[in-house]
UniProtKB/Swiss-Prot annotation:
Protein name per Swiss-Prot or TrEMBL: Small ribosomal subunit protein uS8
SUPFAM superfamilies recorded: Ribosomal protein S8
Signal peptide location: none
Complex and partners: Part of the 30S ribosomal subunit. Contacts proteins S5 and S12.
Source species: Methylocella silvestris (strain DSM 15510 / CIP 108128 / LMG 27833 / NCIMB 13906 / BL2)
Family: Belongs to the universal ribosomal protein uS8 family.
Superkingdom, taxonomy of origin: Bacteria
Record GO terms (molecular function): rRNA binding; structural constituent of ribosome
This protein's UniProt keywords: Ribonucleoprotein, Ribosomal protein, RNA-binding, rRNA-binding
């Protein structure tokens, strides 16, 4: 079955796996998903991920989820910009999540990065998701 929102599908898989206290979750691979997973890993929301490549050019990521005292590190992960309604933000209008305790992942001309890195680089872009 075709997925209309691949990034939203990955975020939903992560959210559902953490609610079920799974250690790992598989998701189809893409460059955008890899960049978002890189940001989640560098910000400490996931342990890491590995890539599996199949002969037909298809890739799959296995994401290692992170828990602290038995509770998921990611309390909330939510898609902001969707295929039907794109959301863009200038650097001065970049939304803060939980007064700076969470992050917003932004796709900018300089790459996919967390909101604080986008402010530091003085670039705006498409607001992909919020993580808290």
């Amino acid at each position: 079955m075709a997925v209309n929102d691949p990034l939203g599908d990955m975020l939903t898989r992560i959210r559902n796996a953490q609610m079920r206290r799974k250690g790992k979750v598989q998701t189809p691979g893409s460059r955008l998903r890899a960049h978002v997973l890189d940001v989640l890993q560098s910000e400490g929301y996931i342990r890491g991920y590995s890539t599996t490549e199949y002969g037909n050019g298809r890739t799959e990521f296995e994401v290692e989820l992170k828990y602290f005292d038995g509770l998921p590190v990611i309390r909330e992960i939510q898609r902001v910009s969707k295929p039907g309604r794109r959301v863009y933000a200038a650097v001065d209008a970049m939304p803060r999540v939980a007064n700076g305790l969470g992050i917003t992942i932004v796709s900018t001309p300089k790459g996919v990065m967390a909101d604080h890195a986008a402010r530091e680089a003085n670039v705006g872009g498409e607001v992909l998701c919020r993580v808290f």
